[in-house]
């Protein structure tokens, strides 16, 4: 079963917790054992799993990405001027798999699933595929 999420981002760089949306879709499907695939079809956005208890972790991650991949660099040649967004997206990755067992996502105590925007604000698409 496949669900399409439309995500409206509000900043150039942000991490949006989509864990609840993934959990809600899992409940809709009735799948009790299998896997969830969360996929982002964009070259300047991505999907990651990371801590969701302390909001400063997201801020720190975005700050550190900016340190490694500054928005403007004298050697960048990409005509759209968003090479940093492409680099961040490649670092994070386009997808994540999560095991499903007993009708629940198997995530660590502090883990959440994040849609990562690196070239916003925009309306983005994210796919969730439940397999079981």
Curated annotation (Swiss-Prot):
Transmembrane segments: none annotated. InterPro entries: UPF0047_YjbQ-like, YjbQ-like_sf. PANTHER family: UNCHARACTERIZED PROTEIN YJBQ-RELATED, UPF0047 PROTEIN C4A8.02C. Belongs to the UPF0047 family. This is UPF0047 protein YugU.
């Amino acid at each position: 079963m496949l669900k399409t999420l439309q995500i409206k981002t509000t900043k150039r760089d942000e991490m949006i917790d989509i864990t609840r949306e993934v959990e809600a879709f899992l409940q809709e499907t009735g799948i009790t054992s299998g896997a969830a695939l969360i996929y982002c079809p964009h070259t300047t956005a991505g999907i990651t799993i990371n801590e969701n208890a302390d909001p400063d972790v997201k801020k720190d991650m975005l700050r550190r990405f900016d340190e490694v991949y500054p928005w403007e660099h004298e050697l960048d040649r990409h005509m759209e001027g968003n090479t940093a967004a492409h680099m961040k997206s490649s670092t994070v990755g386009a997808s994540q798999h999560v095991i499903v067992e007993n009708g629940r996502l198997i995530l660590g105590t502090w883990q959440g699933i994040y849609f990562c925007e690196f070239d916003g604000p925009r309306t983005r698409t994210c796919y969730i595929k439940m397999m079981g």
